[in-house]
Swiss-Prot record:
InterPro entries membership: Dihydro-acid_dehy_C, DihydroxyA_deHydtase, DiOHA_6PGluconate_deHydtase_CS, ILV_EDD_C, ILV_EDD_N, IlvD/EDD_N
UniProt keyword Iron-sulfur present: yes
Pfam families listed in its UniProt record: ILV_EDD_C, ILVD_EDD_N
Protein name: Dihydroxy-acid dehydratase
EC number: 4.2.1.9
Primary role: Functions in the biosynthesis of branched-chain amino acids. Catalyzes the dehydration of (2R,3R)-2,3-dihydroxy-3-methylpentanoate (2,3-dihydroxy-3-methylvalerate) into 2-oxo-3-methylpentanoate (2-oxo-3-methylvalerate) and of (2R)-2,3-dihydroxy-3-methylbutanoate (2,3-dihydroxyisovalerate) into 2-oxo-3-methylbutanoate (2-oxoisovalerate), the penultimate precursor to L-isoleucine and L-valine, respectively.
Needed co-factor(s): [2Fe-2S] cluster; Mg(2+)
Organism (species): Halalkalibacterium halodurans (strain ATCC BAA-125 / DSM 18197 / FERM 7344 / JCM 9153 / C-125)
Annotated PROSITE patterns: ILVD_EDD_1, ILVD_EDD_2
Active site, renumbered: 470
Length: 555
């Protein structure tokens, strides 16, 4: 066993002495040591219940024949961190989570790891650590929040509150109406109830084969999640016995299939960043063009908030992620159904008994919302290395958008401009110097996109940025523009009034300025001074790579 490194032989007597002090009994020294990587944090609704999950996991591990050791990671609540300096720590927290988990796993030579993530950066950070250390692993997330409800029974989510702020500022909603939404949109623990980043990643974990069916959609308050934990613990012990490791499960075909599910469900654009980072840890080279190739063969089957009013709970009762995966298995060439998973069985075997029970919530393959997937990678002279848009959350009437640039050098400036009414129909809002390096930390733009929607401009204004978006963002919102402004990318040289053309069917974004004019503007450009000059963000900005490579850290 891997853990023999710290418990076998005469030289390890001091180590065993410390293990005894930690509560390990003599008869337990020969059993597998299992790390329980938890992310319990009081201030994050998606994590406030995970202390109880860890207790269930540890008991299940003991019953399955292992010895559990719980440790914790940090986490950032993107909703609470939104719109201020806190958001600059969100994406960088992914790297801390990964590094911290790697540190504990390798320092203590665990034989296996039971990961308990939930919200936005925690799930990918933990999976990156799992793949990096390549120790047998299983994942059970904390589960989605129940949807809020209006008095007339309409679903609410956190996105409803953000968009309500925009509606209030433009006079379309009263303070009392906004307060009612604020008080009812987030009624329970769990990750926010729509197809935002957390639920996108937790759903993808099922397709990646690192979590059991139900992981993405069983609500946090359901006892069924406890059974999921118990089942996963048994599978973990089997993985250790058979020496099935994360890199046996995570292959290039697995990454393809993760994007296929993303396309079918119209997942968050952040999944592109995170899945590329996971591929990087698995030493898989993955070209952005491959994502568009996946989109061409996968239909858009399930619209969830913010693209509709359906919640993750609605998806669960319609058959869950498993039913969507099964539907994709029945489309020739859509996914690779024979891939191995943590059950020791193929992805198809995991979902073969799943059924769509509500084909309004989950459409069948012969009646999709669109014959192509809900995410697109755009290329053009404004984004030579790519940009991403959640086309599934764009009004279907918008195929081509051409407008005049209105340029802001920070999210805060843009928010003020939108609130002041400076942004009008026909504008392309440009928010730059907000990329991984320039932000630093590539903050999310949920506040500006929500303000645009709330002011009734969702089909009349586009927003482009080298930053990124919350999974709750919708509309003509294009992020991850690469190279970013801080690296001298084309977005750094856009001026007010420049024409920008977005062609969704052809997946292009073009800056309608002559090459001569672009070259003239680029003359004499120098890299701007970093916004943060001490602490973690200063180090991060020096080491982080571009969005098109997943925003990982250079070694």
């Amino acid at each position: 066993m891997r853990s023999d490194m710290i418990k076998k032989g005469i030289d390890r007597a001091p180590h065993r002495s410390l293990l005894r002090a930690a509560g390990v009994k003599e008869e337990e020294m020969d059993k597998p040591f299992i790390g329980v990587c938890n992310s319990y944090i009081d201030i994050i609704p998606g994590h406030m219940h995970l202390n109880k999950f860890a207790e269930v996991a540890k008991e299940a591990i003991r019953e399955a024949g292992g010895i559990p050791f719980e440790f914790n990671t940090i986490g950032v609540d993107d909703g609470i961190a939104m719109g201020h300096i806190g958001m600059r720590y969100s994406l960088p927290s992914r790297e801390i989570i990964c590094d911290a988990a790697e540190t504990v796993i390798n320092a203590h030579w665990f034989d296996g790891v039971f990961f308990i993530p939930n919200c936005d950066k925690i799930t990918p950070g933990m999976l990156m650590a799992s793949v990096r250390t390549n120790v047998p692993s299983v994942f059970v997330s904390g589960g989605p929040m129940e949807a809020g409800r209006t008095k007339d029974g309409k679903n609410l989510s956190l996105a409803s509150v953000f968009e309500g702020v925009g509606a209030f500022s433009s006079g379309k909603m009263t303070r009392e109406e906004l307060l009612e939404i604020e008080q009812t949109a987030c009624p329970t623990c769990g990750s926010c109830s729509g197809m935002f980043t957390a639920n996108s990643m937790n759903s993808l974990m099922e397709m990646l084969g690192m979590a059991l069916p139900g992981n993405g959609t069983i609500v946090a308050t359901s006892e069924a999640r406890h059974q999921l934990i118990k089942d996963a613990a048994k599978h973990l012990m089997n993985l250790i016995e058979k020496d099935i490791r994360p890199r046996d499960i995570i292959t290039k075909e697995t990454i393809d299939d993760a994007f296929a599910l993303d396309m079918a469900m119209g997942g968050s654009t952040n999944t592109v960043l995170h899945t590329l980072a996971i591929a990087n840890e698995a030493e898989i080279e993955y070209d952005l063009n491959r994502i568009n190739e996946v989109a061409e063969r996968v239909p858009y089957l399930c619209k969830i908030s913010p693209a509709s009013d359906y919640s993750m709970d609605d998806v669960h009762h319609a058959g869950g992620v498993a039913a969507i995966i099964k539907e994709l298995c029945e489309i020739d060439g859509a996914i690779h159904p024979d891939r191995i998973t943590i059950t020791g069985k193929s992805i198809y075997e995991n979902v073969k008994d799943a059924e769509i029970t509500d084909d309004v919530v989950i459409r069948r393959k012969d009646n999709p919302y669109s014959p192509v997937g809900g995410l697109s990678i755009l290329f053009g002279n404004l984004a030579p290395n790519g940009a991403v848009i959640k086309v599934g959350a764009v009004d279907p009437s918008i195929q081509i958008f051409e407008g005049e640039a209105i340029v802001y050098n920070s999210q805060e400036e843009a928010q003020q401009g939108i609130n002041n009414g400076d942004v009008r129909e026909g504008h392309v809002v440009v928010i730059r110097y907000e990329g991984p390096k320039g932000g630093p930390g590539m903050p999310e733009m949920l506040a500006p996109t929500s303000a645009i929607i709330g002011r009734g401009l969702g089909t009349k204004v586009a927003l482009i940025t080298d930053g990124r978006f919350s999974g709750a963002s919708r509309g003509i919102s294009i992020g991850h523009i690469s190279p970013e402004a801080a690296e001298g990318g084309p977005i750094a040289f856009i001026e007010n009034g420049d024409k920008i053309r977005i062609d969704l069917p052809n997946r292009t974004i073009e800056w309608l300025v002559s090459d001569e004019e672009i070259a003239k503007r680029q003359e004499g450009w120098t890299e701007p001074e970093p916004k943060v000059k001490k602490g973690y963000l200063a180090r991060y900005s020096k080491l982080v790579t571009s969005a098109n490579t997943g925003g990982v850290m250079k070694i």
